[in-house]
A protein has these predicted regions:
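Glycine-rich phosphate/cofactor-binding loops in nucleotide/flavin-utilizing enzymes
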Residues: 2-4, 23-27, 39, 385-431
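C-terminal helix-coil-helix/basic helical segment that borders enzyme active sites and/or dimer interfaces
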Residues: 5, 17, 50-61, 315-323, ...
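Asp/Glu-rich intrinsically disordered low-complexity tracts
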Residues: 5, 9-11, 15-17, 21-23, ...
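Glycine-rich beta->alpha junctions and the first turn(s) of the following alpha-helix
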Residues: 27-33, 38, 246-343
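Internal helix-loop-helix
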Residues: 74-144, 213
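A short, Trp-centered hydrophobic/proline-enriched beta-strand micro-motif
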Residues: 143-170, 174-175
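A short core secondary-structure module
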Residues: 151, 180, 198, 202-246
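Flexible, small-/acidic-enriched active-site or ligand-binding loops
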Residues: 164, 168-169, 174-176, 207-210, ...
Length: 431
């Protein structure tokens, strides 16, 4: 490699830095002062407390995350309550502020209960809970003293949230047949819970995010048999010394920063979330649309970090003997294409987050774009760094996040197919 090639590499790196600075300035101009403060403070804290080694140590704990860091994120920065109403101790900022926070935690691949607690569980409690349940649970979720997880039968989380199919059309919760999770009333009355007593749950939920460590489980279960078939949400509380009938087993995960568990309910005592009648399936779908935006923000943050590492890793490869001029030019062109994909995903995510009420398609479409951008960027990072290097091991962590999220919430093609179905792109508009 000659001096001209080396100079060209230096110019390319400088151009990339200038482009990144320009994008950062443009993003900052579009954010409010409060949102800029949230991003800056959170990024500084995560830079101090996270990294490949720190994250690995955190995932090895019984909780699967760093409890001290979570306390600072929730009680200190108010992350868990950013989008919750102020009367419960939340920030009342709406989805946009929470999406910014998710982008930063995604950039750091920080293991935390943020997704399970603040994105999936808290909105359901706020939407369906009785006044007493909201007053009891939401302030504790906000300050981080209580963590929660959403448990649905089998591996049907994406379907239950309405992301990959119509959650009203398929019997994902059990459908009155064997399997799924079944709920039965234990009080006198008509036998379906209207007698005012408690409930018992029997069944199994797999791939429950943070299900091994959450203090409170929100369990989707089927009840009513064929006569009054319906899906309800129940609260299963962790008791000191263990909850009778509740068995939680942490499973090996493709992405260690996304720990999940199998939850077995063997005639476990439960409390109905809210009151009947309630539009549980509608609340799950609404939560799914918001969750898609937050997952997209995480994926965009991770994709941006993976791209930064790939660009940085290209520098050492430019030394004489490592690559030919043609190979370096091809790598630069690929990174430029990836940069466009990441920025397109970021734009879609920001647009979805800023809508006053995300439409049925904006969140899932942003998630599909972001997952594909993350997978492509992380994959290129693995290829550029080469096998066995430190950079390759770090790039692989981002690829594992992309693959894990697609398994849990995708894949991207099904997210897009469901969006097309809902808009009637290929026929009648779906429910």
């Amino acid at each position: 490699m000659d001096a001209a090639d080396t100079a060209a590499d230096a110019d390319t790196a400088a151009d990339a830095d200038r482009a990144a600075d320009a994008d950062t300035a443009a993003e900052a101009a579009a954010l409010t002062g409060e949102q800029q403060r949230i991003r800056r403070t959170l990024r500084d804290l995560l830079a101090e407390r996270t990294g490949p080694e720190e994250n690995h140590a955190a995932t090895a704990t019984p909780e699967g995350y760093d409890p001290e860091l979570w306390a600072r994120l929730s009680a200190g920065l108010g992350l868990a309550g950013l989008a919750l109403p102020a009367k419960y101790g939340g920030g009342g900022h709406g989805p946009a502020a929470l999406a910014l926070a998710c982008e930063e935690t995604g950039r750091a691949l920080a293991p935390s209960p943020l997704l399970a607690t603040a994105v999936l569980a808290a909105p359901l409690i706020a939407a369906l809970g009785t006044p007493a349940q909201r007053a009891e649970l939401l302030p504790r979720l906000v300050d981080g003293s209580l963590t929660s997880a959403l448990a649905v039968p089998g591996g049907s989380l994406a379907l239950a949230l309405g992301l990959t199919g119509d959650n009203t059309a398929e019997d994902w919760s059990g459908g009155g047949r064997a399997g799924g999770i079944q709920a039965r009333a234990v009080a006198a009355g008509d036998g379906d819970g209207s007698g005012g007593g408690g409930w018992r749950l029997y069944g199994e939920a797999a791939q429950v995010l943070d299900g091994h460590s959450a203090d409170l489980l929100l369990v989707a279960a089927h009840t009513g048999g064929f006569a009054r078939s319906r899906t309800l949400l129940f609260l299963v509380r962790e008791r000191e010394g263990g909850t009778p009938g509740l068995v939680r087993t942490r499973r090996n995960a493709l992405d260690l920063t996304r720990p999940h568990a199998t939850v077995e309910l063997r005639d476990a005592e439960a409390e109905l979330l809210g009151e009947e009648p309630a539009d549980v399936l509608g609340a799950l779908a609404a939560t799914g649309r918001i969750a898609a935006v937050m997952l997209a923000a995480e994926a965009v943050g991770a994709a941006g970090a993976a791209l930064d590492r790939a660009i940085a890793g290209l520098g050492p490869r430019a030394r004489p003997g490592h690559r030919t001029a043609g190979a370096l030019q091809a790598a630069r062109s690929t990174l430029a294409d990836l940069y466009v994909r990441v920025e397109a995903a970021r734009s879609l995510t920001y647009c979805a987050a800023r809508e006053s009420g995300p439409g049925p398609e904006s969140g899932p479409l942003a998630l599909a774009q972001a997952l594909e951008a993350l997978r492509a960027t992380a994959g290129e990072g693995v290829r550029l760094h080469g096998g066995g290097s430190t950079g390759e091991r770090e790039a692989r962590l981002f690829y594992q996040r992309a693959a894990s999220d697609e398994l849990l919430f995708g894949p991207a093609r099904r997210l897009r197919a469901r969006a097309a179905e809902r808009t009637g792109l290929f026929g009648e508009v779906a429910a």
